[in-house]
Amino acid sequence: MKNLFLFCRAGYEKECAAEIQQRAAELNVGGFVKANNNDAYVVYQCFEEDGGDTLVKQLPLDSLIFARQMFAASELLADLPESDRVSPIVAALSEVSKAGELRVETPDTNEAKELSAFCRKFTVPLRQHLKKSGSLLAQENPKRPIIHVCFIGPGRAYVGYSFSNNSSPYFMGIPRLKMAADAPSRSSLKLDEAFAQFVPKEEQEVRVRSGMNAVDLGACPGGWTYQLVRRGMMVSAVDNGPMNEKLMETGQVKHFREDGFRFEPQRKNIYWLVCDMVEKPARVAELIEAWAINGWFKEAIFNLKLPMKSRYKEVMAILNTMQEILKENGINEFQLQCKHLYHDRDEVTVHLWIRPSQAWN
């Protein structure tokens, strides 16, 4: 297929477009971007007929900051007849064979979500016809490709596929997390989503486990500390402001009424460092770099608040500088990931894992 369809947050189409333009060029897949403000999606139109196939295979979704989900896509199917929308879609998917799942989706906008009820109903007959054509297996198979049909408006859809090992497990790339009734703030969901994004399920018992020591810089009132406590960690919560009383009653939290930028940990066996401070992103990055150079943590999750303009450029500059500084200070083995999470707004979440090949005692 010729195109790559990418879901993103409404208002971040320019950032998603700039990123896919750069990343596709790195893979020598030429093309141009189609994007409109607040559509919540971007289409990268490749010059080569199989450009979308190449990108969906070679470009890891997890390496993209602003895309929630992506799939190799056909040209836009416009003016689908009300009397038979199924046949043109089945025909457009003729080159897809034995897919394991069907997702009929919309972009994440209020206008597009008005089609949600239609999409749910339409899935049933479409699934039956795709099974008859051989594009879809009779039984769901999580190891096979996923068929995507994304309605961007009434009678208008992009169709295509993604690979299950390079795709979000969620419809539209949106995780459905529930806000706990006793969580101190909604920001709690950001760290919950970040753990799911950056730490594979099969590794969470080792890397996100009870008994670990953690530090939360800028902790007040305790939204991120809550997620650490919920996972059984012992937390040093650093903030001049007050902490949630119920969190303090757990006995797992020690509150340091200090400036997060000046705090130095008493413990030297800290595994997790987390930080969600409203501060210039470069300053937060410098703080994390200092902690890494001092060897004060193994893994960190932190948020970078985004400027109003040149957001992709700013994030990339900070991440590139961080990589250079770590290497200059003898930290040559690390994993650095960044994602504009669903629960993020004008910010991105970054994960830094120092020397992942070395065990933590």
From Swiss-Prot:
It comes from the Bacteria. The active site is at K305. Its main location: cytoplasm. Pfam families: FtsJ (PF01728), RlmM_FDX (PF18125), RLMM_N (PF21239). GO terms for cellular component: cytoplasm. It catalyses: cytidine(2498) in 23S rRNA + S-adenosyl-L-methionine = 2'-O-methylcytidine(2498) in 23S rRNA + S-adenosyl-L-homocysteine + H(+). Coiled coil: none annotated. Keywords: Cytoplasm, Methyltransferase, rRNA processing, S-adenosyl-L-methionine, Transferase. SUPFAM superfamilies: S-adenosyl-L-methionine-dependent methyltransferases (SSF53335). It is found in: Cytoplasm. S-adenosyl-L-methionine binds at S187, C220, P221, G222, G223, D239, D259, D276. It is an enzyme of class 2 (transferase). Its EC number is 2.1.1.186. One of its GO terms (molecular function) is S-adenosylmethionine-dependent methyltransferase activity. GO terms for biological process: methylation; rRNA processing. InterPro entries: RlmM_FDX, RlmM_THUMP-like, RNA_MeTrfase_FtsJ_dom, rRNA_MeTrfase_M, SAM-dependent_MTases_sf. NCBIfam families: PRK11760.1. Monomer. Belongs to the class I-like SAM-binding methyltransferase superfamily. RNA methyltransferase RlmE family. RlmM subfamily. Catalyzes the 2'-O-methylation at nucleotide C2498 in 23S rRNA. This is Ribosomal RNA large subunit methyltransferase M. The lineage of its organism: Bacteria, Pseudomonadati, Pseudomonadota, Gammaproteobacteria, Alteromonadales. The gene is rlmM.
